A protein has these predicted regions:
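Cytoplasmic helix-loop-helix junction between adjacent transmembrane helices
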Residues: 111-148
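Residue-level signature of mid-helix packing/kink "hotspots" within the transmembrane helices
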Residues: 34, 62-70, 120, 153-154
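Short hydrophobic/aromatic, small-residue-rich stretches within specific transmembrane helices
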Residues: 55-62
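Hydrophobic alpha-helical transmembrane and interfacial-helix anchor sites in secondary transporters
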Residues: 43, 75, 162-163
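Conserved MFS/SLC helix-loop-helix module at the cytosolic interface between two early adjacent transmembrane helices
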Residues: 67-106
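Helical-face signature of the major facilitator-like transporter fold
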Residues: 25-26, 30, 62, 96, ...
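Extracytoplasmic
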Residues: 17-51, 72, 155
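Helix-loop-helix hairpin linking two adjacent transmembrane segments in secondary transporters
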Residues: 145-169
Length: 169
């Protein structure tokens, strides 16, 4: 922990950059993690799924987003939040895209499970921001980072705006 006020002041722009970028990344990850709540009805119609089948898709994403949180936090502590968050963004983007290319219910289940890794981003961001902020500023920083949960509320607006441009109504 840094106790020298001059050193803290020099690092302030870096801390704020970490905070804003991690909050933006968490917003994106949270939106992806919960995307089946918004996309569920169109997916059910397109694939002719039952309510139970659709609920399995959402459940797999949510479950996987909960299973690995401890490990994700440990990895962030060990290798740094920037690396772990970047890898999570990249490796979650692939199955998120593949959801749009899925041709079967089984593929949707697989991609939903893989998309679920996005739910572990909370642990990574908390560890990352905690390492960058002094104790007396962590409450503000972690509160702002946690506001990334708004990603779930941004989905309907974003998806309803983009879907018509990708061949779906």
């Amino acid at each position: 922990m840094i106790h020298d006020p001059a050193q803290l002041e020099r690092e302030r722009p870096d801390r704020l950059r970490v905070l804003w970028l991690s909050t933006l990344a968490f917003t994106l990850m949270f939106a992806v993690w919960l995307m089946f709540g918004v996309l569920g009805v169109p997916i059910r119609k397109e694939f002719g799924l039952s309510d139970v089948q659709l609920s399995w898709i959402s459940a797999l994403a949510i479950l996987n987003g909960s299973l690995w949180r401890l490990l994700a936090g440990i990895l962030a502590d060990r290798y740094g939040g920037r690396l772990v968050f970047t890898l999570m963004l990249f490796f979650t983007a692939i199955p998120a895209y593949l959801v749009s290319r899925a041709g079967s219910y089984e593929e949707l289940l697989l991609y939903a499970f893989l998309v679920g890794f996005a739910g572990n981003s909370f642990s990574v961001g908390i560890a990352w921001n905690s390492a960058w902020f002094p104790k007396d500023q962590q409450g503000f920083a972690l509160g702002l980072f946690g506001a990334g949960n708004v990603g779930a509320k941004c989905q309907p607006l974003i998806i309803s705006t983009w879907r018509p441009h990708f061949g779906s109504s």
